[in-house]
Amino acid sequence: MTKEIKADAKTRMDKAIDVLSRELAKLRAGRANPALLDRVTVEYYGAQTPLNQLASVTVPEARLLLITPYDKTAVASIEKAILKSDLGLTPSNDGQVIRIAIPPLTEERRKDLVRLVSKTAEESKVAVRNIRRDANDELKKLQKDGEMTEDELRSATDDIQKLTDTYVAKIDEKAKQKEQEIIEV
């Protein structure tokens, strides 16, 4: 039973790391990254459609995104959606494709992004700690029900704590990498 609790905690912590990775990928670090446009939805034939379903997004250069719509009639709608998004990007349209030049970040924007990275990392740490608390509660319930001894409980909670420490260290590492990426000019 304790193995199942540990495995469940590990799976949930892996998911927390995945969420953090996706959130950090969305932050603009002065480099072009197709994930920047993941949240953009386009008005297409009366329905809000994710951009990645209407076009391919590629990175031909470090500071350039190239959006190639599958349907050329959607070019204007895609451009409008990008302008309306809160990304602060300005698309240029040649009728076939849309190019987005990623401007270099200002010092103030870099500081804001570093704060946002720290906040996002802290939220992930809280999620991991909540998972630890849930696992420990389940273990204590097993011990209370007489399914495990006090020593087994202590050993299992120590294992959960080690797992938590490992995942918190992974979160710190990912946050540090993203901060370095943002700070580099």
UniProtKB/Swiss-Prot annotation:
Main location, first listed in the record: cytoplasm
Molecular function (Gene Ontology), one example: ribosomal large subunit binding
GO-annotated cellular components: cytoplasm
Record-level GO BP terms: translational termination
Domain of life, source organism: Bacteria
Coiled-coil intervals: none
Keywords assigned by UniProt, alphabetized: Cytoplasm, Protein biosynthesis
Compartments, record wording: Cytoplasm
InterPro entries recorded: Ribosome_recyc_fac, Ribosome_recyc_fac_dom, RRF_sf
The family this protein is said to belong to: Belongs to the RRF family.
Summary of the function given for this chain in its UniProt record: Responsible for the release of ribosomes from messenger RNA at the termination of protein biosynthesis. May increase the efficiency of translation by recycling ribosomes from one round of translation to another.
Protein name (record): Ribosome-recycling factor
Organism: Shouchella clausii (strain KSM-K16) (Alkalihalobacillus clausii)
